[in-house]
Amino acid sequence: MGKYFGTDGVRGEANVELTPELAFKLGRFGGYVLSQHETERPKVFVARDTRISGEMLESALIAGLLSVGIEVYKLGVLATPGVSYLVRTEKASAGVMISASHNPALDNGIKFFGNDGFKLADDQELEIEALLDAPEDTLPRPSAEGLGTLVDYPEGLRKYEKFLVTTGTDLSGMTVALDTANGAASVSARDVFLDLNAEIAVIGEKPNGLNINDGVGSTRPEQLQELVKETGADLGLAFDGDSDRLIAVDETGEIVDGDRIMFIIGKYLSEKGLLAHNTIVTTVMSNLGFHKALDKQGINKAITAVGDRYVVEEMRSSGYNLGGEQSGHVIIMDYNTTGDGQLTAIQLAKVMKETGKSLSELAAEVTIYPQKLVNIRVENSMKERAMEVPAIANIIAKMEDEMAGNGRILVRPSGTEPLLRVMAEAPTDAEVDYYVDTIADVVRTEIGCDN
């Protein structure tokens, strides 16, 4: 991560940290870096979610892009994966999404996609950051016919919706409850599932600029759970603010998280011989029950650091086509180059339809182990070196010996805060509490700030 770019673009409180001035510079410098080798006039797609700050940042960003001669196609409100899809299929130079994903309305973010539809590589982000920190803006300043042009492109939404529908199957006879988080999915999910002939019930579909992710969406699925039970829906589907992740709800109202969704889709693909290298890519945070279910099914796994960008990097480098995170980011590389909540939802419904099984039946093959996570405040200088402290290393080894393979411990530093995260999974809540609390006590004693 750089000074401005985190693991998912540039984020901050809108108009305070992520200002119009910064958005203009990101448009100008980002557009230049991503299009400097183009032989024809570069084309860049720009979309946003439903936050009140979106139009302000969109206007500033577009002004920056136009100032370096770029032809901008304004998509309006669209899911993040829709930008990625359109960049690839319409052969654009780049795409930009204005969103802070599952964060509250006061935040916003800007993330770039290259002409291949993937998020930027570290070296591209560093090149943009170098221009942001340069003492003087020395980029070209074209005038007259050298300036960029702006094209409103509402048909981009229709093209993305049609693409989604082509990946699915007829859902006649199925009732689907949707929670579009008052976000980007609110302009598309209803139409897509109606086109697939599902009966639908929808909440979180009335964005007002301030209510994105507010008590709704993938991080707050409680209302969706109630809607599923009230309507007798076959499944519920909750997206986040920019619709790049999905959390599902089965017909009994129980949550089906990203681990279980990946397993269900992965098993289906594996049985059809369509799971590349018979492998699913996941992160260190995936539940032990997920790993055991994969082992039982004979499916391999590749494990990365936390963050969908690391999952995608591993998928690209090794030729895998399915990966994701417990949080609901699922990447199905056969269809798109980034996490796509609506695409994942369609594939999940397709598995249900083609197998004739309920979501609870499909999800029951993964027994989720109780999990507990404790954050301990430590000095930044120590969080990366915690495992070098003998007492900490010894207590972790002791707890792992006691687990005898029927549990899991993960101790890792936070990527953004002076915290050490202690996580454990075990068959019972009591065992999880014991393992986490025992390790956490030693960490606090040895290197904790509050000790």
UniProtKB/Swiss-Prot annotation:
Stored Pfam families: PGM_PMM_I, PGM_PMM_II, PGM_PMM_III, PGM_PMM_IV
EC number, UniProt record: 5.4.2.10
Keyword list, A-Z: Isomerase, Magnesium, Metal-binding, Phosphoprotein
GO cellular component, one term: cytosol
Record's keyword annotation contains Isomerase: yes
Keyword Isomerase: yes
Cofactor(s) the protein needs: Mg(2+)
Cofactor binding mode and count: Binds 1 Mg(2+) ion per subunit.
Catalytic activity reported: alpha-D-glucosamine 1-phosphate = D-glucosamine 6-phosphate
Active-site residues, as the UniProt record annotates them: 101 (phosphoserine intermediate)
Superkingdom of origin organism: Bacteria
Binding positions for Mg(2+) per the UniProt entry: 101, 240, 242, 244
GO BP annotations listed: carbohydrate metabolic process; peptidoglycan biosynthetic process; UDP-N-acetylglucosamine biosynthetic process
Modifications after synthesis and translation: Activated by phosphorylation.
Family matches, as PROSITE patterns: PGM_PMM
CDD domains xrefs: GlmM
Family membership noted in the UniProt record: Belongs to the phosphohexose mutase family.
Function: Catalyzes the conversion of glucosamine-6-phosphate to glucosamine-1-phosphate.
Official protein name in the record: Phosphoglucosamine mutase
Gene source species: Streptococcus pyogenes serotype M1
Gene name linked to the record: glmM
